[in-house]
Amino acid sequence: MPPSIPVPSIVTRAIPSLARAASTTTKSTPSKEHHVHSYSPEVLPLGYAVASTHASIKKKTGALDLGILVSTTDKPASAAACLTRNVFKAAPVTVTTQLLQSGGGRARGFIVNSGCANAVTGKKGLEDAWEMSNTVTSQLPPGQRGIGTLVMSTGVIGQPLPISSIISKIPELVRSLDDSPKSWLDLSKSFMTTDTFPKLRAKSFRLGERLVRIAGIDKGAGMIAPSMGPPQPPHATLLGVIATDAAISPPALQSALNYAVDRSFNNITVDGDMSTNDSIICLANGAAGKLETQGRETAEGMEEITEDGHPEEYKVFREELRSFAEELAQLVVRDGEGATKFVTIRVKNAPSYETAQAVAKSIANSSLFKTAMYGEDANWGRILCAVGYTPTAQAIIPNHVSVSFIPSANVSDPTPLRLLTNGEPEANIDEDRASVILAEEDLEVEVDLGDGHEEAKVWTCDFSHEYVTINGSYRS
């Protein structure tokens, strides 16, 4: 017999203790109900009618999952869109792209469904999206049928639409169109999938001599890392629609939307996943009247604003659209799946806007950073690591970089907490003060690249235990 071989004893290594003990307590997601807003009729844009219903797309009985918005003006609205750059574009994205191209940047309205993305569904999915569009258009009054209805879908990828159920509900939707605040809020509910609250915003502003109104709806909580561009060439999910009664030409509207989206929706991330369906549609129907000296509105039509012909009004509109889109985009982050924190990443003194944006996104998409924020752990090494592997990192000078936590308005001491200065760590970081700052729901991280004058902001949330739970059972 071969000699017996002694079995070595198992050596247990002690894990060195960290500077801060990890919490094992699971935090509950804070209530988001205070983000739900309703509006008086005076704030909602003129010349639009909306409706929504249950079409048995969602499993929950009675859940709103199909909606439409129609411009009731004689002339179709100017229309612009920023759509996903994911190569697996969903059928509704393709249909919307083609409708905008064939319609010369004009549309009558849109139809949206939630619960099924109609993505990666082949020829049948494309046929279904066209049938949705064509059926809405055919049900409108004869004077409103000359141009197409855009299409948006959100939900599970790879499953077919219950198209018969959807088509059967469209006549009912068209008959129930109205412009009431309740109908607008219900329309926002028809966008929802894993969202915990409907996202509707509206406001008014002066544009030259006219009072202009704007309303927006979006949805999203997971699969959020949009990279959207104009539909030429065609490029859980982010969907959004912005409707205004301003009069602006299709090219000017597309230009303004590109600018606004790149500084709002393209600067948010929940989990770093770009959807097949991301779509932001903007409609402008020109229904706003001219203000008289007494402050009343006349029914006089508006001349469409163009970028070159009305440069000052165009800039005002573009900035109003940008700030409005930013508010809508932030709602998506605040409703991030399982999120307990809303985090602003501000990168300043960068050599270019593109560099600042790339650095901020790199931090915001870092799973290690996001879990540290959930654990309220001032682990600034994870921030610096994400800065260092940014695709544009060659433009960064390490010994120029500084990192700080910026306290929220609720913290008594507003002084920034410096963690790193010109590439050197601070010798005595106040961990107790860091804990106070990180305990707040709203957080801000500031990264100073020290090598320019450009700045970008990106908004993200933390990763919690609940995010895994939600996405581990998404289809059930």
From Swiss-Prot:
It is an enzyme of class 2 (transferase). InterPro entries: Arg_biosynth_ArgJ, ArgJ-like_dom_sf, ArgJ_beta_C. Keywords: Acyltransferase, Amino-acid biosynthesis, Arginine biosynthesis, Autocatalytic cleavage, Mitochondrion, Multifunctional enzyme, Transferase. Its EC number is 2.3.1.35, 2.3.1.1. Coiled coil: none annotated. The record marks T154, G155 as: Involved in the stabilization of negative charge on the oxyanion by the formation of the oxyanion hole. Substrate binds at T193, K219, T237, E337, N471, S476. The active site is at T237. The keyword Acyltransferase applies. GO terms for cellular component: mitochondrial matrix. Pathway: Amino-acid biosynthesis; L-arginine biosynthesis; L-ornithine and N-acetyl-L-glutamate from L-glutamate and N(2)-acetyl-L-ornithine (cyclic): step 1/1; Amino-acid biosynthesis; L-arginine biosynthesis; N(2)-acetyl-L-ornithine from L-glutamate: step 1/4. It comes from the Eukaryota. One of its GO terms (molecular function) is glutamate N-acetyltransferase activity. The alpha and beta chains are autoproteolytically processed from a single precursor protein within the mitochondrion. It catalyses: N(2)-acetyl-L-ornithine + L-glutamate = N-acetyl-L-glutamate + L-ornithine; L-glutamate + acetyl-CoA = N-acetyl-L-glutamate + CoA + H(+). The record marks A236, T237 as: Cleavage. It is found in: Mitochondrion matrix. SUPFAM superfamilies: DmpA/ArgJ-like. Its main location: mitochondrion. Heterodimer of an alpha and a beta chain. Belongs to the ArgJ family. Catalyzes two activities which are involved in the cyclic version of arginine biosynthesis: the synthesis of acetylglutamate from glutamate and acetyl-CoA, and of ornithine by transacetylation between acetylornithine and glutamate. This is Arginine biosynthesis bifunctional protein ArgJ, mitochondrial. It comes from Cryptococcus neoformans var. neoformans serotype D (strain B-3501A) (Filobasidiella neoformans).
